[in-house]
């Protein structure tokens, strides 16, 4: 038995286009959508190139978040959220690695020099 539905064929002609629906539906401001990350947390410092991402978000975190959104991985929900495992840069983290290795070399040289001078003074 077939069901008879009452569909008006002229609705396709008279219904609003998506851009018209967006203009008439002003309930949700777009700024509130942009200030949330993948988990629904608010973004205090958005990235300049991508405002839907936190400023210091690592690329791997972005990939994992997208993977979660695509696969709906249940194990992902049990992992800590962004605030708990996110990289927080400090002044030392922006120092080039060559300076860090140079500093350790200078410290080693200085300690060797001080030990040599102290041994010389003890012989006198």
From Swiss-Prot:
Which cysteines are cross-linked by disulfides? none
Short name of one Pfam family? DUF2406
Give Gene Ontology CC terms. Answer: cell division site; cytosol; nucleus
> Which BP terms in the Gene Ontology apply to this protein?
regulation of cell wall (1->3)-beta-D-glucan biosynthetic process
The record's annotation in InterPro entries points to: DUF2406
**PANTHER family on file:** MEIOTICALLY UP-REGULATED GENE 9 PROTEIN
Q: How does this polypeptide assemble, per the annotation?
A: Interacts with dil1.
What name has this protein been given in UniProt?
Uncharacterized protein C19C7.04c
The species this protein belongs to is Schizosaccharomyces pombe (strain 972 / ATCC 24843) (Fission yeast)
């Amino acid at each position: 038995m077939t069901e008879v539905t009452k569909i008006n064929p002229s609705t396709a002609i008279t219904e609003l286009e998506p851009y018209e629906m967006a203009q008439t539906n002003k309930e949700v401001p777009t700024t509130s959508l942009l200030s949330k990350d993948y988990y629904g947390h608010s973004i205090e410092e958005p990235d300049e190139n991508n405002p839907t991402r936190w400023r210091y978000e690592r690329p791997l975190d972005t990939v994992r978040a997208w993977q979660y959104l695509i696969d709906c991985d249940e194990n992902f929900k049990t992992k800590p959220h962004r605030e708990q495992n996110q990289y927080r840069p400090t002044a030392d983290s922006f120092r080039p690695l060559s300076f860090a290795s140079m500093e350790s070399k200078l410290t080693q040289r200085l300690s060797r020099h001080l030990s040599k001078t102290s041994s010389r003074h003890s012989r006198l």
